[in-house]
A protein has these predicted regions:
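Mixed-charge (Asp/Glu-Lys/Arg
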Residues: 1-130
């Protein structure tokens, strides 16, 4: 699944988790926002990141600026991975919500009960000296 497919997958998962007015933004000129959606009365600007490594501070900053551009009440970064300490600190200070691999897994399980198995992310073993 490439990044574009991941955005559409996340949009469907959000719909199945009770979000309404879920829209995938156009690829260019999206101001870092991949999905806009509402949960109750709260409108969200959401950036999706399909990464192998940790998601950094830049994604949080882009979600925050995209929130302002789209006039949303909240911003979130949704990833199949985890976040760096710097990203967590910035999110805490700015109010951007961080939805990591564990949150995404829970949302997928709720969206597709009993249908999908998601493997645990394997941690790389440190290289041993010869």
């Amino acid at each position: 699944m490439d990044g574009h497919d991941f955005e559409y997958f996340c949009a469907e998962v959000l719909k199945r988790n009770g979000f309404s007015r879920v829209n995938v933004t156009v690829a260019s000129g999206d101001y870092g926002i991949d999905i806009t959606a509402c949960q109750g009365a709260t409108s969200y600007a959401i950036q999706c990141k399909r990464y192998h490594g940790s998601v950094g501070n830049k994604a949080v900053q882009e979600a925050l600026s995209g929130k302002v551009y789209y006039g949303c009440k909240a911003a979130a970064v949704l990833t199949n991975s985890y976040f760096t300490p710097q990203a967590k600190e910035t999110a805490h200070k700015t109010g951007v919500e961080l939805w990591d691999r564990d949150k995404l897994t829970a949302m997928v399980k709720k969206a597709y009960p009993g249908q999908i198995w998601i493997p645990k992310q394997k941690k790389a073993k440190p290289k041993q000296k010869p």
